[in-house]
Design a protein with these regions (language model features):
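Secondary-structure transition/capping motifs at alpha-helix termini
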Residues: 58-61, 88-97, 145-146, 163
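Conserved helicase motor "Helicase C" RecA-like lobe of SF1/SF2 P-loop NTPases
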Residues: 75-119, 154-158
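Interdomain helical connector at the RecA1-RecA2 junction of SF1/SF2 helicase-like NTPases
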Residues: 1-66, 83, 87
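Conserved RecA-like ASCE P-loop NTPase motor core of nucleic-acid helicases/translocases
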Residues: 65-75
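A short beta-strand element within the Helicase C-terminal
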Residues: 149-153, 157-168
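Conserved motor-coupling elements within RecA-like helicase/translocase cores
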Residues: 97, 103-149
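Well-ordered alpha-helical segments embedded in enzymatic catalytic cores
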Residues: 43-54, 135-139, 152-156
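Short glycine-/polar-rich loops that comprise or flank the Walker A/P-loop
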Residues: 1, 66, 95-99, 164-168
Length: 168
């Protein structure tokens, strides 16, 4: 029989698991699971694909090709992941006319408990090192130029940001 487990094995496994069963706070567990899902590479790469393709198809041609978009993320770690996935996707697709900048405060560091973070652990991410094309310019001015079409933000520029080219 395929995929067969006898009662004796099931009983032993159940006994081992029951002895290690610990109660957790349901709210904390939900927060952790949601954080894991939001930061997972596959989830972010799929969202980035939709964002870029939507921008390319529906937004990019507005305002005589000058249209801009802003993507608001729920955390600084998420903003870093979106920027990395965004850059990877546009490179893979050969899209040279779509570039993103990322805006967040301070430094972002990943740890071993973050999903798919092994390649990111030990690195410090800042606006400066994630936006090499700023070339000393202030972010608002750089975003107004032709160098950037999409701004990925976390806890920044969400209110009071006046960019007339912002269409999406």
């Amino acid at each position: 029989l395929k995929n067969y487990t006898n009662y004796k094995v099931v009983y032993k496994l159940t006994q081992k698991l029951a002895s290690k069963d610990h109660e957790v706070d349901a709210k904390k567990a939900k927060v952790k699971v949601n954080q894991w899902v939001r930061l997972h590479d596959h989830n972010i790469s799929q969202k980035v694909k939709v964002i870029i393709e939507h921008f390319k198809k529906n937004v990019m041609g507005l305002l005589g090709g000058q249209a801009k978009a802003m993507v608001v993320t729920s955390s600084r770690k998420e903003a870093v992941r979106y920027k990395l996935a965004f850059d990877k996707y546009v490179t893979e697709q050969g899209y040279q006319s779509i570039q993103a900048m990322v805006a967040f405060s301070g430094e972002v560091e990943f740890n071993d408990s973050d999903p798919n973070s092994s390649a990111l652990v030990g690195q410090k991410f800042t606006e400066h090192n994630m936006n090499p094309n700023l070339k000393g310019r202030e972010m608002r001015k750089a975003f107004d130029s032709d160098d950037y079409q999409v701004m990925l933000v976390a806890n920044k520029f969400q209110t009071g940001f006046d960019q007339p080219k912002l269409c999406a």
